[in-house]
């Protein structure tokens, strides 16, 4: 009986560490952390992935109630959150780009209550939906799960690694939030700026024209037309952002 209890405790100690890393990743990564994926589904997915990764390596037996165990808990949470946050940069770039487009169209006050992101402009919400579909079409959910499972080979549990190169990589990658937003929003913003200048010239030539009655509907209509015409190029840019995020995850695992 004592032998059986000891085996169960040892199994729990070995399953605990991959479970913590996988759970931290599922709580922060896009698509897996949305409200539509309930806590029950995330727990079941974490258990399934833990059971899949368990035969792939020899797991150290570390008591979580010791100082070494507490250190290992924080380490696994850090790794899982790190990998999930690298993907969240793409979602942040879409929100910033959507906000810029909405402001140019005069829709900055037209917000939707997103349970995941809070108050998000309608254009940003539209881009997030498109990016989710592109993420699934690329097989992103399979790619990130395979990278997560590969992390147990490249960043083994119980081994220390230098955090400074990882922090430098995170800071470098965070600039993609603004670069991605510029890539998505700049063509539409420049076009709307030229239309705005044209409306200003018309107002100057015909002062009796009520620019507020004509300008706002014209900007919204022009923005919708430009957005529909630019969807092909926007889709390619979103695809490029996701592919870069997969590369940076792979690079982060290599740096560690």
Protein language model annotation of sequence segments:
Residues 1-256:
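Hydrophobic alpha-helical segments and their helix-loop boundaries in membrane
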